[in-house]
Regions:
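Active-site environment of divalent metal-dependent phosphoester hydrolases
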Residues: 12-16, 42-45, 73-78, 157, ...
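Short acidic-glycine loop/turn motifs at beta-strand connectors
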Residues: 145-147, 239-244
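Active-site neighborhood of divalent metal-dependent phosphoester bond hydrolases
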Residues: 43-140, 177
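Acidic, His/Gly-enriched loop-helix segments that form or flank divalent-metal centers
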Residues: 110-224, 228-233
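Residue-level marker for buried hydrophobic side chains located in beta-strands
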Residues: 7, 34-36, 68-69, 149, ...
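N-terminal active-site segment of His-dependent metallophosphoesterases
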Residues: 1-53, 59
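A general structural motif
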Residues: 2, 29-32, 63-65, 146, ...
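Divalent metal-coordination and catalytic microenvironments
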Residues: 10, 39, 54, 71-72, ...
Length: 249
């Protein structure tokens, strides 16, 4: 029997969705692997709670291997903390105010704008505890097992060839890349990724419930598990090799 791997889509601060989806998993054993695809923070109301669960509780609850990948939103906050990146924190759509409010234990309304004080605080990231920044900085860019390659956003193409993550000179590209050529044209070992919400991918190219454009997207050799958690959608966990899904909805 092949070892089981469970890939958790982008959580984006939705602690309730994460708890609901995890509660639907079958009992895990020491041979299983639980992989979180990154983007733990921003947009949803409980980024601090998600980070606490992933950092402290899941290592105790998961009997097998736990892999927490780095997402582009973790990369964004690391850049903010190391010198500032206003282009990341200012756009309302990035949901950075929700993260600040979460770590301050304060609520946030949808599309609410930050105060002047909050905007200054966000631009420096000083509200993030050092231990959280250190944790984000230690998150790996990718993982691979017998079933698939797991990476937050996708693979990088160079000279007409899709590079294995180990060949990518700048690993941050693995967190931010977004090109339809990858989803439509990649052929090779299966890749599981998040980052691009499935509602933005062509449903007719998905072999998994193409009638539901919000559902997990399964192409020829690419599977996308970002089903909109924290931004009006739900959270999906994919079990490999069985291709079973467990959803928060």
């Amino acid at each position: 029997m092949a070892f089981r791997t469970f890939a958790v889509g982008d959580v984006h601060g939705d602690l309730a969705a994460l708890e609901r989806a995890l509660a639907k998993l079958p009992p895990l054993d020491a041979k299983d692997t639980l992989i979180l695809m990154g983007d733990y923070v921003d947009r949803g109301p409980h980024s601090a709670g998600v980070v606490e669960l992933v950092r402290r509780e899941l290592p105790r609850r998961v009997p097998g291997k736990l892999v927490c990948l780095r997402g582009n939103h973790e990369d964004g906050w690391l850049r903010v903390a190391s010198g500032g990146w206003p282009e990341f924190v200012i756009p309302v759509a990035n949901g950075c105010l929700a993260t600040l409010r979460s770590f301050r234990d304060q609520p946030v309304k949808e599309n609410e704008l930050p105060t002047r004080e909050e905007l200054v605080t966000m631009q420096h990231g000083e509200f993030l505890p050092d231990e959280i920044v250190d944790w984000m900085n230690a998150l790996p860019y990718w993982y691979e097992d017998e079933h698939a390659i797991y990476v937050h956003a996708g693979l990088v193409e160079k000279d007409g060839r899709w590079l294995h993550p180990s060949e990518t000179e700048n690993p941050t590209q693995l967190l931010w890349v977004r090109t339809m050529r990858f989803f439509e044209g990649y052929r090779g070992k299966r890749v599981v990724c998040g980052h691009t919400a499935t509602e933005n991918l062509p449903p007719e190219l998905s072999s998994f419930t193409p009638e539901d454009p919000l559902d997990m997207w399964v192409g020829e050799d690419v599977i996308v598990v970002d089903t909109g958690s924290g931004k009006g959608g739900f959270l999906t966990i994919l079990e490999l090799p069985a291709m079973k899904t467990y959803e928060s909805r």
